[in-house]
């Protein structure tokens, strides 16, 4: 059955980004919209922004970001299927970039510390996806760390019909899900029942609790490496453009996935999208 998408909203927060500015310790108040534009013109080409403008379509975009292991990829795929749209992952762009260079993903991740152009190229391709010109389906769901902020940039160029979601859950919940993925269901269930359900001030406190239980020792080390890498990425984007993609002011809908199964989260997401004004008939 063909799905007809009826767009009935133009969110003010998207059409006119809330401020376009965030505080960066080294630079003071930074206009991240201008920061993105300057980076594109420098690394992609002087006409790159004009080319993005000309590629803009009316196709709706659901842009999803969030903490690790919050279920954002699962929900993005489910939404794309539900609305008959395309699923796109920024992580896929990163892997393709590494393959084109003939290097591993880990090697490319290390290059990010010194080569700003890698980030900018991936972000520009993300903006091209948001523009929708090369999209065959009626909408797209784009998942990654920065698509919502790239969506705000595209909104400044005239792109409409964007909704930006952020998925979050506690560090404890993220660690438990990582244990389930890396060490299996048994380790997950032990951790869930015995790791105190409280707000942890830092990763080391959580690591200590897990090490006491003697479950998934190597897995939790990998989890902490991933968490530290995420912090590095946030600092890098702050320095490059002037925004922190963990700043919730850049989103329209915040989803808390703590202690929730994917089906429950999906139902909540659909309700939030409906309340926001997104509807498919």
Tell me what each language-model feature is:
Residues 64:
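Hydrophobic anchor at the beta1->P-loop junction of P-loop NTPases
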Residues 73:
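Walker A/P-loop
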Residues 90-160, 171-176, 180-220, 224-225, ...:
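ATP-dependent small-molecule kinase phosphotransfer cores
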Residues 2-52, 214-220, 224, 228-281:
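NTP-dependent small-molecule kinase module
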Residues 67:
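P-loop (Walker A) phosphate-binding loop of NTP-binding proteins
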Residues 70:
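ATP-binding Walker
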Residues 52-59:
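Phosphate-binding P-loop
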